[in-house]
């Protein structure tokens, strides 16, 4: 009879052997993130299916991917129209669109969720995915603010669940945070890292901590700039100039907040504050709340900390 240690080792080997090479990727959510992930996956010669309940969102995503590819092709083959067309077609031919989750995940080797940051909606989606997908399918989330342990709470097999946090715009941003929670298997994690490298990203590993690496450092930095301004210690303009010229940042914290979206910044910080109310760095900003309540969400709305034409 096998000892418990041997049994665990055999199970680990079995799990590793069962996981298949990633060829078929299903991305759920046809927004900017989902579209970008689809583009880089198809560009890496993977078979891609993009799923969204909204047909018009799928059509918009398809057109957006095509336009993005045309820009890439024009830059790569500036004087060769035929090569440009061939590049665009070769990538688009590997992307399918669908409104049916169950049908789209049944042959997937990897599922990437890129939908709204609502934990109840995500849990409902993952319940459907786990039932319809193969037992070896890797199931991941692109969440930027929610804990994997909370999202995957009801999954029966948590060993094949992990996080793939891409950055917007996906085709241009080189980083991919590969996130593992306490039950993510080594085999799953290693395959997610391999996938990241396949799609041309530099991967960094992180445990299931709020905001992972980038947002955990970046969002509190932006909020500390807000507190500096709210206390009257310096103007927004001077804070932005100081961080650009003194720290070498490409954008100051207020410019960056407007670029990210003030509603997005507020959503992330509100979620962290609810989970960790004693953490001073996660304290909400009255000014930010007021701007968001007024519909001033940054560049996308025409006004945030600054006004945009």
Swiss-Prot record:
Record's GO cellular component terms: mitochondrial matrix; mitochondrion
- What chemistry does it catalyse, as a reaction equation? a (3S)-3-hydroxyacyl-CoA + NAD(+) = a 3-oxoacyl-CoA + NADH + H(+)
- As recorded in UniProt, coiled-coil segments are none
UniProt pathway:
Lipid metabolism; fatty acid beta-oxidation
Q: Which UniProt keyword terms apply here?
A: Fatty acid metabolism, Lipid metabolism, Mitochondrion, NAD, Oxidoreductase
Where does the entry annotate site (Important for catalytic activity)?
165
What's an example GO BP annotation here?
fatty acid beta-oxidation
Report the Gene3D superfamilies cross-referenced here: N-(1-d-carboxylethyl)-l-norvaline Dehydrogenase, domain 2 (1.10.1040.10), NAD(P)-binding Rossmann-like Domain (3.40.50.720)
Kindly report, in one word, the top-level EC class recorded for this enzyme: oxidoreductase
Chief location category:
mitochondrion
Q: What is its EC number?
A: 1.1.1.35
Which cysteines in this chain are paired by disulphide bridges? none
Location in the cell reads:
Mitochondrion matrix
Q: What does the sequence similarity comment in the record state about its family?
A: Belongs to the 3-hydroxyacyl-CoA dehydrogenase family.
List the PANTHER family. HYDROXYACYL-COENZYME A DEHYDROGENASE, MITOCHONDRIAL (PTHR43561:SF3), PTHR43561
Q: Give the multimer and partner information.
A: Homodimer.
What is this protein's record name? Probable 3-hydroxyacyl-CoA dehydrogenase B0272.3
């Amino acid at each position: 009879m096998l000892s418990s240690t041997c049994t665990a080792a055999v199970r680990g080997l079995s799990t590793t052997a069962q996981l298949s090479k990633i060829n078929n990727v299903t991305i759920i959510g046809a927004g900017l993130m989902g579209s970008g992930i689809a583009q880089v996956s198809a560009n890496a010669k993977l078979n891609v299916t993009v799923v969204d309940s909204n047909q018009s969102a799928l059509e918009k995503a398809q057109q957006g991917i095509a336009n993005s590819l045309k820009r890439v092709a024009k830059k790569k083959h500036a004087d060769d129209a035929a090569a440009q067309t061939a590049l665009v077609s070769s990538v688009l031919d590997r992307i399918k669109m669908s409104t049916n989750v169950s049908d789209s995940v049944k042959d997937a080797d990897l599922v990437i969720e890129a939908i709204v940051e609502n934990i109840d909606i995500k849990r409902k989606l993952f319940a459907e995915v786990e039932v319809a997908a193969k037992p070896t399918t890797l199931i991941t989330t692109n969440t930027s603010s929610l804990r994997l342990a909370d999202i995957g709470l009801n999954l029966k097999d948590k060993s094949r669940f992990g996080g793939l946090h891409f950055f917007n715009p996906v085709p241009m941003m080189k980083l991919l945070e590969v996130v593992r929670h306490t039950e993510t298997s080594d085999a799953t994690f290693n395959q997610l890292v391999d996938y990241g490298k396949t799609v041309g990203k530099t991967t960094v590993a992180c445990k299931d901590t709020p905001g992972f690496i980038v947002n955990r450092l970046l969002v509190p930095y932006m909020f500390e700039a807000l507190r500096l301004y709210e206390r009257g210690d310096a103007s927004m303009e001077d804070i932005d100039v100081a961080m650009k010229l003194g720290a070498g940042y490409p954008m100051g914290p207020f410019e960056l907040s407007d670029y990210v979206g003030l509603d997005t910044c507020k959503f992330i910080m509100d979620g962290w504050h609810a989970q960790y109310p004693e953490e001073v760095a996660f304290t909400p900003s009255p000014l930010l709340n007021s701007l968001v309540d007024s519909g001033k969400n940054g560049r996308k709305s025409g006004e945030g900390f600054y006004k945009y034409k």
